[in-house]
Swiss-Prot record:
One of its GO terms (cellular component) is plasma membrane. Residues 1-18, 91-96, 157-173, 221-238, 285-287, 358-360 are periplasmic. InterPro entries: Glycosyl_transferase_4, PNAcMuramoyl-5peptid_Trfase, PNAcMuramoyl-5peptid_Trfase_CS. The gene is mraY. Pathway: Cell wall biogenesis; peptidoglycan biosynthesis. It comes from Escherichia coli (strain K12). This is Phospho-N-acetylmuramoyl-pentapeptide-transferase. Belongs to the glycosyltransferase 4 family. MraY subfamily. HAMAP family: MraY. Its cofactor is Mg(2+). Catalyzes the initial step of the lipid cycle reactions in the biosynthesis of the cell wall peptidoglycan: transfers peptidoglycan precursor phospho-MurNAc-pentapeptide from UDP-MurNAc-pentapeptide onto the lipid carrier undecaprenyl phosphate, yielding undecaprenyl-pyrophosphoryl-MurNAc-pentapeptide, known as lipid I. Residues 46-76, 114-133, 189-199, 252-270, 300-341 are cytoplasmic. It catalyses: UDP-N-acetyl-alpha-D-muramoyl-L-alanyl-gamma-D-glutamyl-meso-2,6-diaminopimeloyl-D-alanyl-D-alanine + di-trans,octa-cis-undecaprenyl phosphate = di-trans,octa-cis-undecaprenyl diphospho-N-acetyl-alpha-D-muramoyl-L-alanyl-D-glutamyl-meso-2,6-diaminopimeloyl-D-alanyl-D-alanine + UMP.
Amino acid sequence: MLVWLAEHLVKYYSGFNVFSYLTFRAIVSLLTALFISLWMGPRMIAHLQKLSFGQVVRNDGPESHFSKRGTPTMGGIMILTAIVISVLLWAYPSNPYVWCVLVVLVGYGVIGFVDDYRKVVRKDTKGLIARWKYFWMSVIALGVAFALYLAGKDTPATQLVVPFFKDVMPQLGLFYILLAYFVIVGTGNAVNLTDGLDGLAIMPTVFVAGGFALVAWATGNMNFASYLHIPYLRHAGELVIVCTAIVGAGLGFLWFNTYPAQVFMGDVGSLALGGALGIIAVLLRQEFLLVIMGGVFVVETLSVILQVGSFKLRGQRIFRMAPIHHHYELKGWPEPRVIVRFWIISLMLVLIGLATLKVR
C-alpha cells in the first residue's frame, strides 16, 4: 500500500524511491510487525483475562503444566494482526504470492479461532470437531493449490526442487496439487502439535521464516537463482516481506510468551503460522527444504504418529508421552531446558537447510 503511494510521490521528492528497495521494505516490515506485537501484547493479555479466555490444561499431562491453567490464550490474534498489517503496508498489493499466503494465514487463523473459542468459552475440551477442522483446512489448501496450478502449470512454478541435485526438478503436473495440499495442511498441524511449551513453537517458526526470507530473495533474483540452480520465480521476491513480518510478529509475541508465559498463541496462532510456512514453501518450490529447516515440527509430528500407531498395533507406547517434548519433561528435564535445546536444534536445521542450496 505504502509502496504504491511512494511511487506517486517520488516525482515530488526522490527520497521516496527508498520504498522500491526490497531490503528496506523487509527491514521495516519486520520492525512494524514487531512494534505492533509489542504494543498489542499488554492490551491483548488484559482483555483476554477480562474475558476469562484461559488455557485448558489436560489432567493427564505433566504436573508442572497445572500451574498454566487459566493463562490467557488466543494470543495468536495479535500475531496475525501484526503480520497482516505489516504485509499490507510494505508489500506490493498486486503480487499474487502475497495474497496466497494471506488467504491461508487468515483462513487457518479463523479455523483456529473457532477451535479455541469452543475450548475456552464453551468449555469443550475437544474444541472444533476434528473432521470439520480438517475439512475446512483442506478446502483452503486445495483451493489455493488448484489456483496456483492453473496459473503456473508447465512452468517452474510447478516443478519439484530436490536438494543436492542441480538438474533434478521434475514437472509435477496434477501431483502438484496433492503435494501442496499435504504440505500446507501437514505444516499447519505440525506447528499446532509443537505448541505445547512456553515459546517452543514460536521460535522455530521465526527461524524457519527467516530462512525462507533468504530463499525468497534468491528465488526472486534471476542471477542468484541461476547461480544456486533453483527455479527463478518473478513473484517470489515479495515473499521476503511476508517472511520478515512473521519474524517480527513472532519476536514480539515471544516477549510475552517466553517462560513463564503470560499468554499462549492458541490454535488461532499455531494453525495460521504453520499454514503460512507451508504455503511459502510451496510457492518457493522448496517443500524438501521445509522438511529440513522445520525438522523440529517434523519430529514432533512423527512422535505422535509413532505413539498412536504403536499403541494401536502393539498395545505399547514408545514415548512416555507425545508429542516428544512432553517425553523429555516426564524424564525430568526442566521446561526451559527442553525449550532452549529445541531452539538450538531448530537453528542448526535452518542453517543446514540453507547450506543445501549451495551443496549441489
